[in-house]
Amino acid sequence: METKNQLFFREFNEALVKGDAEKILQSVTDDIVWRMVGNDTIKGIDKLEQALQGMDNGNQFEQDTEHLITHGKEAAVNGLIHSTDKSGEQRHYSFCDIYKLNKHKNGKINEIISYVLEI
């Protein structure tokens, strides 16, 4: 049985894959910091909203979660993401996201560190 925090992070990751900007923005603090290792760092909910608008490229995504670990205000989720573009070309990625909440009960995400590798 999933805990409340495990469900929260599972739903958040599903929102990322589906491009559900509303769900994503409701789940983070105003001062969110999202560090994508080897790429960009997004600081603040306004910058995150701008980045989410730029992510809708018409690709279809599926996610297979391998592990979802929570402890207190922190969580780690890893797995595979499968992407199919408009022409049918597929790409596959391995990912690991590390999360920190602003508080233990009913917290929102205030820090994300993401590692993504094309495989």
Specify the residue positions occupied by each region the protein language model found:
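Short, low-complexity N-terminal intrinsically disordered segments enriched in polar/charged residues
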Residues: 1-26, 30
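Structured beta->alpha junctions
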Residues: 13, 40, 67-69
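Short glycine-rich loop/turn motifs that provide flexible caps or phosphate-binding loops at active sites
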Residues: 18, 43, 71
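A short gly/proline-enriched turn/hairpin at secondary-structure junctions
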Residues: 33-42
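A beta-strand edge to alpha-helix "cap/lid" segment located at domain peripheries
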Residues: 35, 49-119
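Short beta-edge strand/loop motif at the mouth of beta-sheet-based domains
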Residues: 41-50
